[in-house]
Amino acid sequence: MLNTICIYDYGTGNYSSVENALKKLGRKVLISNHMDILKKSDGIIFPGVGSFPTAMNSINKKKIKNQLIRLIKNKKPILGICLGMQILTECSEEISFSKGLSIIPGEIKYNISKKTNIGWKKIHFISSKSKYHSLNNEYFYFLHSLSYKGPIKYQKAITKKTFE
C-alpha cells in the first residue's frame, strides 16, 4: 500500500484538492519538489491546473529533470492529473513549444478547432479488458482545449463527439 504520497510542487496546481482527497483515504501527504523527499515517498502525484511551460520551467530550474525521469523509470508509482499527465509526454504546444519528461510517447496538441471542449460527453474505452470498462458509455465532464496525440497503446479511453 502507498502510505506516503508526495504531491510534486511545480508552483502551480490543485494541491489542496489532491491533498484533502488523499488524507480522507488515510495517506500521509507531502508537497515538495526536493529529490530526497520524492525518493523517500511511496508514490508521486503530479497535480493538475496550470500551464505546461510553467510546470516544465519549474522542473528545469530545479535541475532535477533527469533524476525525476530515472526515479519514474525505476518504477516509482506516479499519477498525473490533467497537466500532471501532460508533462509526462514528450512535448506540448500550449502557449509555446515545451519539452516534457518523455515518460509517455506522444505530444499535447491543441484541438483541431482550437475551441475549448466543454460539457458532458460519453466516454468509450478502447479495450474491453480495461478495469474501468464498466464505465463505458457513461458521461464525463470535459473542460480542455488540448488533447494527447500518441500511440494507441497509451490511449485508454476516447470521446467520439467532435468539438463544437
Mark where each language-model region is.
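Short acidic low-complexity segments
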Residues: 29-40
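Pocket-forming structural segment of enzyme catalytic cores
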Residues: 91-163
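Short acidic/histidine-rich motifs immediately flanking catalytic phosphotransfer sites
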Residues: 38-48
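Short hydrophobic segments within beta-strands
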Residues: 8-10
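Cysteine-nucleophile active-site neighborhood
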Residues: 50-119
